Amino acid sequence: MRAKDIRAKAGDEPITMLTAYDAPTAEIAEAAGVDVLLVGDSVGNTRLGYDSTLPVTVDEMASHTAAVARATDDALVVADMPFLSFGADEADAVDNCGRMLKEADADAVKLECGPHTVSLTKTLSDLGIPVQAHLGLTPQRENETGLYRQGTDEESANRILELAREHEAAGAFSLVLEHVPANLAASVTDALSIPTIGIGAGPDCDGQVLVVDEVVGLAEGTAPFSKRFGDVRGEMREAIEAYTDAVDSGSFPGDEHSHYEDDIEDIY
């Protein structure tokens, strides 16, 4: 799968996208039919113990992206560019994004976008680095906007639509729309020739993306626009409790889990 293959799905077949942060998750998700694996900066608060995505570094993203890429054969691997890895200096941004393809074997990068990323999107696209744009709620700007629904009034909705058009013209191959009204997402989808992938953006986008921890039930809670499809957290706790109980009771390890050599004499 390449960026051009995802772009070709616009208005055709639904796109499934899911976060992945490690090789086992990537392998399972790809086997389950996921089209796009997003190595999200949400690795910060799902795997690394941070309170938000803001502390995540380029090195951390490269490491997790490489792990996902090593376990992936067909799905498109998209590396999320972390806070302050782009936007201030274009040359630095190109270097950081280039690392994700050269060192981590990603297929594309995702940028949380605004007016400042239109030029960068064109530069990256011209250099052969596929860009997935991200508009609406952009968590890296939480200190400015808060983690609230975006595009809820005419002015902000028009701004999102215009930025979507500008990033498409700059070369973005797809667009993530997060936590925006469903009717706005539908309008943006109709206005673009590249696919839109929604998260909390209603049913009319070309695809959907969710955080894997929420999908499988590993997270303690879920976003209001997400859905749990399993209870991995409960199953993990049950299995670990069974293990600790077995060790405490002396029932593990048993003879079937132990190996003895008849020709070794008692050393005592």
Swiss-Prot record:
The free-text function statement in the UniProt record for this protein reads: Catalyzes the reversible reaction in which hydroxymethyl group from 5,10-methylenetetrahydrofolate is transferred onto alpha-ketoisovalerate to form ketopantoate.
Substrates-to-products reaction catalysed = 3-methyl-2-oxobutanoate + (6R)-5,10-methylene-5,6,7,8-tetrahydrofolate + H2O = 2-dehydropantoate + (6S)-5,6,7,8-tetrahydrofolate
Cofactor comment: Binds 1 Mg(2+) ion per subunit.
Give the residues the record marks as binding Mg(2+): 41, 80, 112
Question: According to its UniProt record, in which pathway does this protein act?
Answer: Cofactor biosynthesis; coenzyme A biosynthesis
Q: What is its EC number?
A: 2.1.2.11
Question: Which residues are catalytic?
Answer: 178 (proton acceptor)
Q: Where in the cell is it found?
A: Cytoplasm
- Biological processes per GO annotation: coenzyme A biosynthetic process; pantothenate biosynthetic process
Gene label:
panB
UniProt similarity note:
Belongs to the PanB family.
Q: Which GO terms describe its molecular function?
A: 3-methyl-2-oxobutanoate hydroxymethyltransferase activity; magnesium ion binding
Return the protein name.
Answer: 3-methyl-2-oxobutanoate hydroxymethyltransferase
Top-level class of the enzyme under EC nomenclature: transferase
Which cysteine-cysteine pairs are annotated as disulfide bonds in the entry? none
Cofactor(s) the protein needs? Mg(2+)
* Annotated keywords: Coenzyme A biosynthesis, Cytoplasm, Magnesium, Metal-binding, Transferase
Give me the residues that bind 3-methyl-2-oxobutanoate, please: 41-42, 80, 110
On subunit structure and binding partners, the annotation says: Homodecamer; pentamer of dimers.
Q: What is its main location?
A: cytoplasm
One Pfam family of this chain: Pantoate_transf
Annotated Gene Ontology cellular component terms: cytoplasm
